[in-house]
Amino acid sequence: MSEVTRVVVDAMGGDYAPEWIIRGAVEAINEGAKAQVILTGKEDVIKKELAKYTYDQSKIEVVNATEEITCHEAPVQAVRSKKDSSLVVGLNMVKNGEADAIISAGSSGAILAGGQLVVGRSKGVKRSPLAPLPVSYTHLTLPTNSLV
């Protein structure tokens, strides 16, 4: 793994995408995150949103993906049929060593299915982990359900 963590961020995944996803990526970079952010999604839409911010442009890369997976789609079918979705493009980057991690606020089912179908599980992991971040205005809870 490189010194700087290369993190794919699915810019099109989530209820408030891409605006809030991109804002979060820019804020992370501006606050000193030691990461190279790779935003996947519709390049023209992402670049238009990025133009609203001031940030170190060498730390954010945009990779075009023409399709999106929504929460209303069957996860496995969506991952298999939408090869140029922002999620699947990002997962392939992780699989091919072009990125170290992926973050998505999109369909949980598609994220789990894609992780297993595209990237695969790490040795010793029996069941795919899910780490949602439930938040309130007063605290953050970090549950996990991985089985190693």
Predicted stretch roles:
Residues M1-A105, A110-Q116:
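Contiguous, glycine/small-aliphatic-enriched amphipathic segments in soluble metabolic enzymes
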Residues P18, P129-P132, P143:
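Proline-rich intrinsically disordered, low-complexity coils
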Residues E27-A28, A110, G114-P134:
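A glycine- and small-aliphatic-rich helix-loop capping segment at beta-alpha/alpha-beta transitions
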Residues T138-T144:
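Conserved small/polar residues in nucleotide/adenosyl-binding loops
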